[in-house]
Regions:
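Sec-dependent N-terminal signal peptides
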Residues: 4-13
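A conserved amphipathic terminal alpha-helix motif
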Residues: 162-201
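Hydrophobic ligand-binding cavity/cleft-lining segments
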Residues: 20-93, 184, 188-191
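Hydrophobic-ligand binding "helix-grip"
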Residues: 21-24, 28-35, 107-154, 162, ...
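Intrinsic-disorder/low-complexity, polar/charged segments enriched in Ser/Thr/Lys/Arg/Asp/Glu/Gln
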Residues: 51-59, 98-100, 115, 127, ...
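N-terminal signal peptide c-region/cleavage motif recognized by signal peptidases
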Residues: 15-17
Length: 201
């Protein structure tokens, strides 16, 4: 059974650009973990600002187009993404270069459902950037990056997010999200993509 490996770094929240953030994936240890099928996560929290940054990655045995289709499948996303109760397209560009999407997410049984509205900008098939434009959270922004492996064995899917809910959240909830919920979401994405690809063969 594939294991989840969590790399959690608690300290000051650092804001870096995407290329600098992705350099963490070049680590030999991280590369070994990805090759072994692990979901790798690292996070940083700023308790004073109630903000957090998270980077995560997983290897998917599929090409970028297959992964892209699942990432954009709003209609079916709640059926395989843990905690996501609703995904709705609110608006979209005529040329398909961006969409406005609304999410309702239940992070924990004793917390209210969080409503989030964000704009997603698409650079097919390699990148999706998103940022908050409405909803309950004070700030939310991040990216999905799809990098094909040189040997053609699959794609590294990297997820980056900076979030500031604007209200206090118990650190136990944040730790649980890093330790359990985010790896489950990326594993669910991998399972969905690989199962759809297998069904087409």
């Amino acid at each position: 059974m594939r294991e989840f490996l969590i790399i959690a770094t608690l300290g000051a929240l650092a804001t870096t650009n995407a290329s600098a953030t992705s350099s963490w994936l070049d680590s030999h240890d991280v590369q070994q973990q990805l090759a072994a099928g692990q979901v790798v996560v690292r996070g940083a929290m700023d308790g004073r600002a109630m903000a957090a940054r998270v980077d995560a990655a997983v290897k998917v045995h599929a090409d970028r187009d297959a992964i892209w289709g699942v990432l954009k499948d709003c209609d079916h996303a709640p059926s395989f993404i843990p905690g996501l109760k609703r995904c709705q397209r609110v608006a979209s560009a005529p040329d398909g270069s961006w969409e406005v999407i609304a999410h309702d997410v239940k992070y924990s049984w004793f917390m209210p459902t969080i409503h989030s509205v964000f704009r997603a900008d698409y650079q097919r098939p390699s990148r999706i950037d998103f940022h908050r434009i409405g909803g309950d959270l004070k700030d939310e922004q991040g990216s999905w990056l799809l990098e094909p492996l040189p040997d053609g064995s699959g794609t590294i899917v990297e997820y980056q997010m900076q979030i500031n809910p604007g209200f206090w959240i118990p650190q136990a909830i944040v730790h649980r999200s890093l330790r359990k919920e985010l790896p489950e979401a990326l594993a669910a994405l991998r399972i969905r993509v690989e199962s759809l690809q297998a069904a087409r063969r």
